[in-house]
């Protein structure tokens, strides 16, 4: 993966951003710019978005550009967006939750530019929408694999920030763990960063030192997996198939496939019929999936997970189905009750089986 990225950057890097491709005659009036919170070489969140960008450029013929490692909560984001608009880019895709307020303000300022925000909830009626995926679906499946793999009964979860997106993933993962291994527990350690390999690795090591023999994560690098590999533990990565970084530790990963969604956004802009929405795609839509399961995982486990995957896609299984209690034993869902989207999107509690605090 990194060799492909290096070749791409070697061709087109300058002034802190990269312009890629020349577009087509049909798409001459539409140009799409992507703002990334991490480096393209993270092999995780940003890498997955850049794969989607490349796919969209190839499918639509539209010129694209990107800028990487743009921090949240600073003036850098707005400055980069203004630079892109000055260059004629009229589709702006921001790929981090913390960009949301800036994107909302910029969408009002530039009504002729399409703004699409990944992972947020803000939108308007004209030129600003949001996109995300039901990652809790493959998170649940990956938890089934992890629960089947643990021998100590303790799984460490290295996580960035206590926001609903991350908490929802931890809970779905834990419910999958419990489906395979009801006595196993998941302990969360917060890093307060999306991408810092040193911090991620240290956090994973702290969990390994506590006796965890499987590490899961909501982070952007493979550092946690490398620590698991060194300790002889197992690992569930995130964002992409990171098996190359820790092949002996790797179990599976919930992964993103942004390309088709980006094609839809860009094609709508080209046709001048972009309509803002809150898109929350699923495994059935293809925006999220489960990476291949490691070859040394018992076939009975693979069969169990694939059966659950088929049931989720068919609408016969929902990870957040009652009875469901929070970690203090309070009932959240009654037997057979399915959690509504609004409750999932605002989730700020841990389910039973999680060790740690959301605060």
Predicted regions and their residues:
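C-terminal motif of bacterial Sec signal peptides marking the signal peptidase cleavage site
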Residues: 18-21
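Bacterial N-terminal signal peptides that target proteins for export
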Residues: 1-9
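Hydrophobic helical h-region of N-terminal Sec-dependent signal peptides
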Residues: 9-15
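A residue-level marker of the well-folded mature domains of exported/periplasmic proteins
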Residues: 26-359
């Amino acid at each position: 993966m990194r060799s492909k990225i290096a070749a791409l950057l070697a061709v087109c890097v300058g002034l802190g951003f990269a312009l890629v491709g020349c577009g087509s005659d049909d798409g001459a009036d539409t140009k799409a710019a992507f703002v990334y919170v991490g480096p393209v070489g993270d092999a995780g969140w940003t890498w997955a978005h850049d794969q989607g960008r490349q796919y969209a450029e190839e499918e639509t013929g539209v010129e694209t550009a990107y800028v990487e490692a743009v921090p949240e909560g600073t003036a850098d984001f707005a400055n980069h967006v203004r630079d892109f608009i000055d260059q004629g880019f009229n589709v702006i895709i921001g790929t981090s939750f913390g960009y949301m307020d800036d994107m909302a303000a910029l969408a009002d300022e530039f009504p002729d530019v399409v703004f699409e925000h990944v992972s947020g909830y803000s939108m308007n009626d004209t030129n600003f929408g949001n996109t995300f995926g039901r990652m809790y679906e493959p998170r649940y499946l990956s938890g089934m694999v992890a629960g089947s793999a643990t021998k100590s009964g303790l799984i460490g979860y290295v996580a960035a920030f206590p926001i609903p997106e991350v908490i929802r993933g931890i809970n779905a993962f834990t419910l999958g763990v419990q489906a395979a291994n009801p006595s196993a527990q998941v302990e969360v350690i917060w890093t307060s960063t999306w991408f810092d390999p040193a911090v991620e690795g240290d956090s994973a090591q702290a969990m390994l030192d506590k006796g965890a023999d499987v590490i899961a994560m909501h982070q952007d690098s493979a550092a946690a997996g490398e620590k698991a590999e060194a300790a002889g533990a197992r690992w569930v990565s995130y964002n992409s198939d990171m098996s190359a970084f820790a092949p002996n530790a790797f179990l599976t990963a919930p992964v993103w496939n942004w390309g088709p969604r980006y094609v839809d956004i860009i094609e709508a802009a080209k046709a001048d019929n972009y309509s803002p929405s809150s898109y929350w795609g699923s495994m059935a839509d293809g925006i999220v999936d489960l990476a291949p399961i490691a070859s040394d995982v018992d076939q009975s486990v693979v069969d169990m997970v694939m059966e659950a995957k088929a049931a989720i896609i068919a609408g016969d299984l929902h990870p957040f189905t009652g009875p469901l209690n929070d970690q203090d034993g309070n009932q959240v869902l009654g037997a057979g009750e399915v959690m509504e989207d609004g409750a999932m999107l605002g989730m700020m509690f841990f389910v039973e089986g999680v060790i740690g605090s959301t605060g």
